[in-house]
Amino acid sequence: MDFIKKYLYVCDHPGFFELTQETFQNRWFPAQINLSVDVKCLSLMSEADVNFYKYLFTFLGMAETLVNFNIDELLVDFECHDIKHYYCEQMAMECVHGKVYFNILNMLFKNNLAATWEFAEAVLKDEALQKKLEWLESKIKMAKTKAEKVLIFYLIEGVFFISSFYCIGLLRVKGVMPGVCMANDYISRDELLHTRAAALLYNTMIPKEERPSSEWVVSLFKEAVEIECAFIEAKTKQVTFVSMDDIRAFLEATADRLLNSIELPRYYKSDPPQSCPLTYTGCIKNVSFFERESTEYSSFIINDL
């Protein structure tokens, strides 16, 4: 019977079943992102701005693989069909994100792969990124229990990339890079779903008696907010439209939302900035994905026999 339960699918987690269905409905593909107008926008941007976004997309492109490694390690601790099915879908979407980031980098570096790799080598040695990665590595090593591992994963999903998405969203405010902005909408929407999944994993699969103290969790989030602020602040000198006050407020509001989602009180009690450029992160613009033109987002199955 144990063998049958392990290999014969039955719905064993309605919450993750629903998230998997939502992922199916929200599927999209790299070919849907048209960067032809974005190429022309490069000449409208300052050198400092272009270099900043090269840096962000190089970081994000490499980070997608890191997330999939973390998922592989996390799933070892859970025997649940619906959890595994959901995370298979999430890993597939992370691969889509990685391909889109490659296409964007290809556009930014004008199809010069050697220049892209050379730039990526420099990014890996960058002090701001090193501090961020060292902090994250220390927290991953520190996480011994299942609860701590899930919390670190939740933190990665919810905080580790969010200030980068915010800065990319500012391109829309500048009136440039429509394809990149659309990709950022799709990806930030996906990452919101991934963050909801990590919260669901913690809330439903980690018994309350096994969870760390609220003080421990809040301390972890406070450190993450400071690390993320320092990461962006180090790279945004001379970059237009970036306000560190707004980014800090956004990060604090995001941390509060994440804490609330795992049944803990808000710590910062901050509100996101009114000018928040992100559509799908639950910060200020409550626009439903399905209220946008469905033809922009949906793939249609033709002659499906």
UniProtKB/Swiss-Prot annotation:
One of its GO terms (molecular function) is ribonucleoside-diphosphate reductase activity, thioredoxin disulfide as acceptor. Fe cation 1 binds at residues 64, 94, 97. Keywords: DNA replication, Host membrane, Iron, Membrane, Metal-binding, Oxidoreductase, Transmembrane, Transmembrane helix, Viral latency, Viral reactivation from latency. The chain crosses the membrane at residues 150-170. It is a single-pass membrane protein. It is found in: Host membrane. Gene3D superfamilies: Ribonucleotide Reductase, subunit A. Its cofactor is Fe cation. The active site is at residue 101. One of its GO terms (biological process) is DNA replication. It comes from the Viruses. Disulfide bonds: none annotated. Belongs to the ribonucleoside diphosphate reductase small chain family. This is Ribonucleoside-diphosphate reductase small subunit. It comes from Alcelaphine herpesvirus 1 (strain C500). The gene is RIR2.
